[in-house]
Amino acid sequence: MKTLRYLLLFTASLTIASCQGKVNSQANDSSDKNSGSPVTIYYFHGEHRCPTCLAIEKETKTTFEVNLSKEAEAGTVEFEVINADEAKNQALCEKYGVYGSTLLLVKGNKTVNLTNMAFSNARRNPDQFREELANEVKKLIKG
């Protein structure tokens, strides 16, 4: 019985840990040499995802398809979902220092990490999540 209890505790801890990406609320202020490059919304995730992780992907996709549809059609924004646990994505994960659930906006040399905002709002305040994500993307598009 104790073994089962410890196994369940370990599994729960592992699941929660896999939902925590490298969280830095920062923007790299390097000069953007590719001002014409699109903003890429990267949502990185692991194999095991919690309800909040699933909500982040769902709400990011909704934002991309609804709130940013004109920008997507114009080619100024794109959205990619990346499984951080797959070997083929290792180089991209290392490039951005990602090992779990992480939401990044990238344009040229500039990176904005929205992971904290995503975990705070995707499930409980999806309207606020979509508004903040769309605003951040539009700021990057404008430069």
Regions found by a protein language model. Give the residues of each.
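Bacterial N-terminal signal peptides that target proteins for export
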Residues: M1-L8
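C-terminal motif of bacterial Sec signal peptides marking the signal peptidase cleavage site
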Residues: T15-S18
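Local sequence-structure signature of Cys/Sec-based thiol-disulfide redox active-site neighborhoods
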Residues: N34-V66
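Bacterial signal peptide processing site
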Residues: Q20-K22
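Extracytoplasmic/secreted envelope proteins and their assembly/folding machinery
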Residues: E57, K61, E65, Q90, ...
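Structural micro-motif
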Residues: C93-K107
